[in-house]
């Protein structure tokens, strides 16, 4: 969903370039992302961070991991980063990329990212837009290019069609998972919901009684 523009967004992002990296700088940062964090530790990347509730929650819950939230919408990335900054200042283990998730391999070297998260991605329901889905084969190739061998992609959605499409896409690409790695109703599963950090969309869909689908797939 496209957010209404915020007049303050552009200036705020420019003033906080230490925590929000634009696309050009992100490309130049390849192989050197650890230098932006206080400590060298595994980097987890969320593609399509929206307003940032998930990535902030994860960074607060797991200080032993460095997190990067990537978002293409200026308003969304500004809201996410400012919310984080206003609540807790500059977190030592959280940075953002204001950029496109298409071509993520131009930002990171092989193995530089330890895990990729996709949360409530745009389903792009029309067949002619299939290649825009973040679980389409060209995106999977990009994720594989930055993850270590057998790297993991974690995907959550409320959209049953997109979930089924994604499972087929993962399988066709050669990715694997076990029965313990997926659920058709996350919040009805006491074991799998442990440690779950909710997104803004997730909370909205839960309030409507819609099931949340989740899978962890490995290359």
Curated annotation (Swiss-Prot):
Please name the Pfam families in this protein's record: Methyltransf_4
Which cysteines pair up through disulfides? They are none
Tell whether Cell membrane is among the UniProt keywords: no
Q: Look up keyword Nucleotide-binding and say if it applies.
A: no
Molecular function via GO: tRNA (guanine(46)-N7)-methyltransferase activity
Q: Where does substrate bind?
A: 126, 158, 199-202
**InterPro entries, per the entry:** SAM-dependent_MTases_sf, tRNA_(Gua-N-7)_MeTrfase_Trmb, tRNA_methyltr_TrmB_bact
Keywords, alphabetical: Methyltransferase, S-adenosyl-L-methionine, Transferase, tRNA processing
Query: Which pathway does it serve?
Result: tRNA modification; N(7)-methylguanine-tRNA biosynthesis
Q: What is its EC number?
A: 2.1.1.33
In terms of Gene3D superfamilies, this protein maps to: Vaccinia Virus protein VP39
* Positions that bind S-adenosyl-L-methionine: 46, 71, 100, 122
What Gene Ontology cellular-component terms does the record carry?
tRNA methyltransferase complex
Give the reactions, separated by semicolons, that this protein catalyses: guanosine(46) in tRNA + S-adenosyl-L-methionine = N(7)-methylguanosine(46) in tRNA + S-adenosyl-L-homocysteine
Tell me the active site. Answer: 122
**In UniProt terms, what function does this protein have?**
Catalyzes the formation of N(7)-methylguanine at position 46 (m7G46) in tRNA.
Indicate the family of this protein: Belongs to the class I-like SAM-binding methyltransferase superfamily. TrmB family.
Q: What is this protein called?
A: tRNA (guanine-N(7)-)-methyltransferase
Annotated source species = Leuconostoc mesenteroides subsp. mesenteroides (strain ATCC 8293 / DSM 20343 / BCRC 11652 / CCM 1803 / JCM 6124 / NCDO 523 / NBRC 100496 / NCIMB 8023 / NCTC 12954 / NRRL B-1118 / 37Y)
UniProt lineage: Bacteria, Bacillati, Bacillota, Bacilli, Lactobacillales
